């Protein structure tokens, strides 16, 4: 079984007052609150979501 590469994403800023699409993107990434960290598979779709809300999250490879 092949180990897939993962990426850790942490929400740094609040989603209050942000664009509805950006709030939905955070929800899609599984982020719920400030300092919440999730580990996701490193795929092009996940990277695209991260790029959309780059100013609210921190990414660790």
UniProtKB/Swiss-Prot annotation:
Matching PROSITE patterns: RIBOSOMAL_L30 (PS00634)
Pfam families with a match to the protein in the record: Ribosomal_L30
GO molecular function: structural constituent of ribosome
Keyword terms: Ribonucleoprotein, Ribosomal protein
InterPro entries: Ribo_uL30_ferredoxin-like_sf, Ribosomal_uL30_bac-type, Ribosomal_uL30_CS, Ribosomal_uL30_ferredoxin-like
Top-level lineage group: Bacteria
GO biological process, any: translation
A GO CC annotation given for this chain: cytosolic large ribosomal subunit
Family: Belongs to the universal ribosomal protein uL30 family.
Subunit structure: Part of the 50S ribosomal subunit.
Name of the molecule in the record: Large ribosomal subunit protein uL30
Species in which this protein is naturally found: Colwellia psychrerythraea (strain 34H / ATCC BAA-681) (Vibrio psychroerythus)
Gene name of this polypeptide: rpmD
């Amino acid at each position: 079984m092949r180990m897939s590469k993962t990426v850790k994403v942490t929400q740094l800023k609040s989603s209050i007052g942000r664009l509805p699409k950006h709030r939905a993107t955070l929800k899609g990434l599984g982020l719920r609150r400030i300092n919440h960290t999730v580990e996701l598979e490193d795929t092009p779709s996940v990277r695209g979501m991260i790029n959309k809300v780059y100013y609210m999250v921190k990414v660790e490879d």
